[in-house]
């Protein structure tokens, strides 16, 4: 028999079946006593015969049962032993043989070359990879009788299922394999303790002495040569190397950014320093700026505060002023004028507030005209017939809808910028706003106050010049009353209160500037 069969262990209790025909299957097993039970079944006559043979063939040939004229089919798992015949080494993969014998402690390695161990030459080694549903996808190869080293000249077929091919997947579990040949008492080979290789690098090489004992791998891939395994390793390694290179190239390399330094843009000023024709030296209309600076809400708050002043408090204030002047022993025109102006301003403001105020019954807003109150009341109703043509918003008033649509168009007609009387000096930050109330809120902020500060300083200077001009005119007309006129002017300039008539005057800007000093 083959020298490779010398390491097979002797297992008791396994029946042997031989089937005559084109493809016959037999399982040989020996008992410890040395007797071999062989059962042959003929496919044509459906007869069975039981023979009892001596232990000569079992002991001499490594426990292999024989049946003359019939070919035997074996299933092997485990390690492999290799022999040299004529200087050539032929061996089957280690996964097709049973574990090595305890007597033979030689370590075996995985041989990628699919060859047959024994006195078989490569020319006579024939593989049949035919697959069909009838043979259950089994691979078979035939060993002729002339190539057997045993005196028992017989031909047997060695077949293995498609599921016994080497596993090149990288799962960490092994699959149980049934080695049933025709008997229910056939053992099941399984091993889940030995880990499978988890990466292509761990696939054993030809000269590696790693012991693959009792490791049964299942796969549908055919056996591979060493060159194919190396190519597969390179295919697995190349993507990881490329990924690592791209990763290092993207994350590890420094990033150099050299932005082109552009020269700062210089604000182009008007080349002509001549005064603009539409601007006047003496008369400057600041009504638009004042209307932006002081919103109607501030007016309403001040008007509400003045309502709290009662006539008794006003009279007491005037009495206090007169009492102070009497105790000092001097009665001046300025003090009398101051008290009278205060009382008149207070009474006029109270009367105007009582007559021209139209408060909203649902909120704290107060309006000067009934039409404004009527328009405002629409905002408290649930009716919103005007809807935006661009978005889903709806409005109660048409002008609110038009003002909203300007936001979609990007129209910003209100700008914080202007020129002083000389036509060269500019004021403002240049920001644009879509609504006038947004610009007025900007003026009330600290930044907006700095924007209009040059304009206020110019207004203060022009008012002082106007006051000096008036004083000179009065001095020319009435020289004896010069002091009285100057005091009267001082009272009119410095003691004017914040009432409704004062909002449309440019003196308001001057008053705000003096209050911040």
UniProtKB/Swiss-Prot annotation:
Subcellular location(s) of the protein: Nucleus
A GO molecular-function descriptor: zinc ion binding
Induction (free text): Expression is down-regulated during growth at pH 8 by the pH-responsive transcription factor RIM101. Induced during exposure to the weak acid stress of acetic acid, through the regulation by the transcription factor MNL1.
Domain of life: Eukaryota
GO biological process terms, semicolon-separated: cell adhesion; cellular response to acidic pH; cellular response to cold; cellular response to copper ion; positive regulation of cell adhesion involved in single-species biofilm formation; positive regulation of cell-substrate adhesion; regulation of single-species biofilm formation on inanimate substrate; regulation of transcription by RNA polymerase II
4Fe-4S keyword on record: no
Biased composition (Low complexity): 19-61, 174-185, 308-318, 325-346, 469-485
Biased composition (Polar residues): 186-196
Described purpose of this protein according to its UniProt entry: Transcription factor that regulates pH-induced filamentation with RIM101. Required for yeast cell adherence to silicone substrate and biofilm formation.
Protein name: Transcriptional regulator CRZ2
Native source organism of the sequence: Candida albicans (strain SC5314 / ATCC MYA-2876)
